[in-house]
Amino acid sequence: MSKVSFKITLTSDPRLPYKVLSVPESTPFTAVLKFAAEEFKVPAATSAIITNDGIGINPAQTAGNVFLKHGSELRIIPRDRVGHC
């Protein structure tokens, strides 16, 4: 089974830490979101993953689909920061 890798950056931290995750293509993206949130110690239930262009990603698809549509560089944001100026 093929794997896809994502570089996920925590945008709410000024140091912009990131994690590189490699998962099977068929992994539900909700699992990727949950794991990334746990790695950054932010609540998964109130976090969103977006592209570098700021486009939100629907987690109800496979990791392979997300990789094909949006590429490997993504950002995770705690939802209390969504639309925050």
UniProtKB/Swiss-Prot annotation:
Cross-link of type Glycyl lysine isopeptide (Gly-Lys) (interchain with K-? in acceptor proteins): positions? Answer: 83
Principal localisation: nucleus
Name any GO cellular component annotation. nucleus
Coiled coil start-end? none
Where in the cell is the protein located? Nucleus; Cytoplasm
Entry keyword set = Cytoplasm, Isopeptide bond, Nucleus, Ubl conjugation, Ubl conjugation pathway
Record GO biological process: brain development; protein K69-linked ufmylation; protein ufmylation; regulation of intracellular estrogen receptor signaling pathway; response to endoplasmic reticulum stress; reticulophagy
Q: Does the keyword GTP-binding apply?
A: no
InterPro entries according to UniProt: Ubiquitin-like_domsf, UFM1
* Pro-piece positions: 84-85
The answer, when asked if Ubl conjugation is one of the entry's keywords, is yes
- Give residues for the crosslink Glycyl lysine isopeptide (Lys-Gly) (interchain with G-Cter in UFM1): 69
Top-level taxon of origin: Eukaryota
UniProt's post-translational modification comment states: UFM1 precursor is cleaved by UFSP1, promoting its maturation: processing of the C-terminal Ser-Cys dipeptide is required to expose its C-terminal conserved Gly residue.
Family of this protein: Belongs to the UFM1 family.
Chain's role: Ubiquitin-like modifier which can be covalently attached via an isopeptide bond to lysine residues of substrate proteins as a monomer or a lysine-linked polymer. The so-called ufmylation, requires the UFM1-activating E1 enzyme UBA5, the UFM1-conjugating E2 enzyme UFC1, and the UFM1-ligase E3 enzyme UFL1. Ufmylation is involved in various processes, such as ribosome recycling, response to DNA damage, transcription or reticulophagy (also called ER-phagy) induced in response to endoplasmic reticulum stress.
Oligomeric and partner information: Interacts with UBA5. Interacts with UFC1.
The name of this protein is Ubiquitin-fold modifier 1
Q: Which organism is it from?
A: Bos taurus
